[in-house]
Amino acid sequence: MEFEVKSPILGFESVRGMRLEKIDDLFMKLKNAEADSPVFTLVNPFLLREYDFEIPLAMKVLLDLKENTNLLVLNIMIIHTPLESSTVNFLAPVIFNFDNHTMGQLVLESHRYPAYGLAETISSFFNSDSTPTQEA
């Protein structure tokens, strides 16, 4: 599904359209709709940990978010080898509005969300049997 970028992903301000593709319940891929790059691996944070933040009014207006908006929140994951050492950025969620096909990255204030890191290792959220430690 294609989305219009209303608040760009940091470092990719010129990208205006992105395509979201589901891999499975935990992972998705986000690709530039008009070029070969950038391509991001995204993760559903709610399947990994308790994750809650306030969406500022400016972002709500930009994405036209309402009380009943069909939205999805994902986080960018940096893939490493081995996969268990891959990291997740919980301080800059990507928000998708499925009702109007808009999206944007929100940068959270680290002092307001000290439990969230820029590069948290994904293995810290899994038990030894490879299942997430908690579900939302």
UniProtKB/Swiss-Prot annotation:
One of its GO terms (biological process) is bacterial-type flagellum assembly. One of its GO terms (cellular component) is cytoplasm. This is Flagellar assembly factor FliW 2. Acts as an anti-CsrA protein, binds CsrA and prevents it from repressing translation of its target genes, one of which is flagellin. Binds to flagellin and participates in the assembly of the flagellum. Pfam families: FliW. It is found in: Cytoplasm. HAMAP family: FliW. PANTHER family: FLAGELLAR ASSEMBLY FACTOR FLIW (PTHR39190:SF1). Interacts with translational regulator CsrA and flagellin(s). It comes from the Bacteria. The keyword Cytoplasm applies. Its main location: cytoplasm. Keywords: Bacterial flagellum biogenesis, Chaperone, Cytoplasm, Translation regulation. Belongs to the FliW family.
